[in-house]
Design a protein with these regions (language model features):
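A cross-taxon signal for low-complexity, glycine/charged-rich
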Residues: 9-11, 27
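C-terminal membrane-associated helical module and adjoining short loops/tails
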Residues: 24-26, 35-46, 126, 176-321
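Residue-level signature of transmembrane alpha-helical entry/exit and packing/kink sites
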Residues: 44, 53, 57, 75-79, ...
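Membrane-embedded alpha-helical segments that form the functional core of polytopic membrane enzymes
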Residues: 58-97, 129-137, 144-157, 196-207
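Acidic (Asp/Glu-rich) catalytic motifs at the cytosolic membrane interface
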Residues: 83-113, 120, 208-219, 318-319
Length: 321
């Protein structure tokens, strides 16, 4: 019997026999494999697409659309659908490019956690970006040109955002061209107000994205980029006068108070909760859009506030960052 002793710590006998319990344990342990693309869980796809931010995309579309005079409801629905595909495709592409980084630092993300293969994510992103850009391009020549510029910014940001210090500008460019694409689909097209609105939204996104970079690359938080979060308030005061200025000031107060509430978690809390701040500021994009159309009838506000609340609710189930 001594010649058939158990090898210490291994549970396998020296004569090569495997104990029955160990055999069942080995048989019951499946090999770790990536599920096929069509088998990826719905939650995996929702997390990859960061769908909790989609209400902010629809809000951008509505703001640009209204600034250009609106138009047929069917065109607006088509616009939102195309923008949705581009956004989700861009988020998929972001994870595909970041797979190596996530494997080292964020193993809970879908690709390093084996919830879906990197190859499948590449395929999803290509299909979504192509489909969304095509849908936006169908809205007209100007829309097609702007949609291609939007696509270029999305791809450049996803490919280089880890290596470029000024990548927040690329992220801001994505929202800039989204608003202009939405305006180009309206009856009046892109005008000066739509251009300025897209620009100040871009400033807000630069400040937001600067903070988001600190979430994955901790370091000293500088205050000056956060000043850009106030850019929409300045434009609202300049372009609205009389009765509309009162509405703009009210909307500005809402935006400002929300931004301060979000920043409190990072600037006046130890340790800083940067993710919480960024998520709140992302939802606040809907309030910035509301500020851009302060001269619209009161019932229009309901749609932007609805997008804001929906974004916050979705963040309870799917991370925004």
């Amino acid at each position: 019997h001594s010649s058939r002793g158990v090898s210490a710590g291994r549970g396998i006998r020296c004569n090569g026999e495997v104990p029955l319990a160990t055999a069942f344990s080995l048989a019951a342990t499946p090999a770790v494999r990536h599920p096929p693309a069509h088998m990826a869980s719905l939650r995996t796809l929702l997390v990859l697409g960061r769908v909790s931010n989609l209400p902010t995309v629809w809000s951008n579309c509505l703001a640009g659309w209204l600034l250009a005079g609106g138009g047929e409801g069917s065109r607006f629905a088509w616009l939102c659908a195309g923008a949705t595909l581009v956004y989700v495709g861009g988020m998929f592409l972001n994870d595909a490019f970041d797979a190596e980084f996530d494997t080292q630092h964020r193993r809970e993300r879908p690709i390093p956690s084996k919830a879906i293969s990197r190859e499948a994510v590449w395929g999803w992103s290509a299909a979504l970006l192509a489909g969304g850009t095509g849908m936006l391009g169908w809205l007209g020549r100007d829309s097609a040109i702007l949609a291609l510029q939007l696509l270029a910014c999305v791809v450049l940001y996803d490919a280089f955002h880890k290596s470029l210090a000024w990548s927040p500008v690329l992220m801001a460019s994505c929202r800039f061209f989204l608003v202009l694409t939405a305006a180009s689909a309206g009856v009046r097209g892109v005008d000066g107000l739509a251009l300025w609105t897209a620009l100040v939204l871009g400033c807000y996104i630069v400040g937001l994205s600067y903070l988001a970079r600190r979430e994955s690359a901790p370091g000293l938080i500088r205050y000056w980029p956060l000043v850009l979060l106030a850019a929409p308030l300045v434009l609202a005061f300049i372009v609205n006068d009389g009765f509309f200025r009162e509405k703009a000031l009210l909307a500005s107060a809402i935006v400002g108070l929300w931004a301060l509430r979000c920043l409190r978690a990072t600037l006046w809390q130890s340790p800083p909760a940067i993710g919480k701040t960024v998520s709140g500021l992302l939802a606040g994009i809907c309030l910035v859009d509301l500020l851009a159309v302060a001269d619209q009838p009161p019932h229009v506000s309901v749609w932007f506030l609805g997008c804001f609340v929906l974004a916050l609710l979705c963040q309870r189930f799917v991370p925004a960052t």
